Each structure stands twice: as structure tokens, then as C-alpha cells.
């Protein structure tokens, strides 16, 4: 089983929890944000030394609250590549509509080559209107009043951008003429003629994987048809199992090949390990509650199960007890955490596991303790 670590990359908070301050009232300093950035790099080195397979960062912008302060994981990934030996470096996720697709392709190819083929192309459509609309696109967020129109526009832009990125990364010469992107634009003069095609420089020297989060029915159909890997997070196991199996069905329909039970699918789980379940719950509760105080209003808890057995209503702020009861978070002693991971392996055939061991507000010292304990006390159970 390949096991990676995923961090938001936020500032430390000594008042994390369900109470005040409200998420919208938080303001981190530039010094705090930069300290977090340096510690994110340090943590990558620790994870490399401990033998984790991969290390994933988020892309977010204008987050004065301090929850996610890394705007360009590829740029940071280049530094990580220089300081590590073997760990793969992924983005969860590059928000594709916020980039020009050719700049994203160039930057990823540069990281991939610099690292000797350790880059992972993680792509997404975004979740936060503050970021998307400021950077020239739209997103159908839960709190966006024109959600449907914005989502349709975003999806169309994402689809074309990914067409461009895949062409640029895999073909020596390419051109693309769609509704959103027209590349190269017609009529560009070049030494007596006009530009008819482009070549990405550099292009990847090594094979690479592409992964996208599975967050909606259209995405569940699109990702396997494209042949990419799907990332599953923050869903009740009933919903995860249904989508996990549907992913394999769509892949087989599109490509004529049956996937192995865990192939091309990654499970993400928030995790906390301690000597006892009670101690682990006490450790993780402030960060759990801060996380949902922050993300609940964006609709991130829609993967929880409501009392009617259907997805919970958007805007739910779950308690830690609900997260544990629904098996969406994995918290306990090393044996209990191992048992819960094995439960998912039995249910889904998981072969790619991404652990989220550091909650919003947690200290990096606590995060480092978690990755050490998981590597020493939990992961050897799956050797």
C-alpha cells in the first residue's frame, strides 16, 4: 500500500475550536504565514526520511485567516524536491481554471524533471469564490448565489484547460481550438508566416500520474473516462463504496479493462493516533472543530450521511463524535487506527492511502509527532 501525507499548510493557532473567533474574523500575519511555509517544507523532509510515498499540498489564495497559506505548491515542490531523495510530490489540488493551462503545464513539467520524475499532477476546479473570481474564473460554491451558472462555466473552462494541458505535456507539437481556449491564437506573425502550432518547453522526461478529487456526479463520470486517478475524501463509507465501484465501472466502459480493487483510486482520511482513544480524541477535537467551522459553510460536509440515509444538507457542522461514528475520521490508539485502515482496505481494496494528520491550528511539532507515530506504530501493520 502506498501511503502519503497531505497538509493544508496553515498557521498555528492557540485558540482553535468551535468557539470564537469566527473563521471570518481571523487574520494571520505575514510572519506567521511564512513560518508555516517553512515548516511545510521541513515536514516534507521528515516524511521523506520516514519512508512515506508521497507528500501533497493544497493551492489557495488570499487566505488571510491562515488556514491554507501556500498559493503555489508546484513552486514550493521544487524546493522540496531539492531537499528530499525519494518522496513523490503532489498537489491536492492545482486549481486549473485559476491558471493559464500552458503555464501550469510548463511549471509541472519543470517540477517533474527537477525531481527526477517525482511530480504528481493533482487537478481540481476550486471551491472558494474569493479565489476563483479574483483570479478570473468562477466557481459554484455552496454560498455562491449563481451557483449553477458559475459551476457550468467553471466546468467548461476546466475541461478545455485539461485538454490543453494533456496535449502540451504529451505531444511534441500541438494546437487546440475550443470555445474557451484558442491556442495558438490565429494570425500570430512569425518570420514571414503565422504560428500554426506550439511546443511545450520543457516537456516531462518521465511518466506522470494525474489525479482529481471526486466531488460530484459529473466528476465521477469524467475522471475515469479520462483515465486519471480519483481521490475520495470526506464521504460516509456507504457513499464512498458506491462511488468507488462506479468509478471502476466507468473506467471499464471507457477503456475496456477491469481495474484491480484499489487501482487508480486514493482514499484520504483525517487521522490522529495517541496512546488511547480518549487521548487521541482530546488531541484532535480542537482542530476538528476549527476545520468544520471553516469548511462547513463552503458545503464540504455534504458527504456525511443525514438521518434519512441520504447526504447531509450542505452547511452541516459535524461534531467529532459524528465524524467518528460515520467513519469519516480515524482516531484512536495505534491498534485502533490500524484496524480502521484495515476496515477500509477490506471494504474498498485500498492501495493508495493519503493521511491528513495535522488539523487547522495544530502546531507543526504536533504534526511531526503524528507522522512519526503513524510511521512507527501503524503503517508497519501493512508491510
Segments predicted by a language model, with ranges:
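N-terminal beta1-alpha1-beta2 module of alpha/beta enzyme domains
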Residues: 1-87, 208
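Hydrophobic faces of well-ordered beta-strands that scaffold small-molecule active sites
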Residues: 3-7, 55-57, 88-91, 119-123, ...
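An alpha-helical appendage that flanks or caps ligand/catalytic pockets
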Residues: 5-25, 142-200, 239-350
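Active-site mouth loops of central-metabolism enzymes
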Residues: 22-37, 94-102, 206-215, 271-272, ...
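Acidic (Asp/Glu)-rich catalytic clusters
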Residues: 48-49, 79-85, 112-118, 224-225, ...
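Conserved, mostly hydrophobic/aromatic
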Residues: 51, 59, 80, 111, ...
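A conserved active-site cap/scaffold subdomain adjacent to cofactor or substrate pockets
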Residues: 213-239, 243
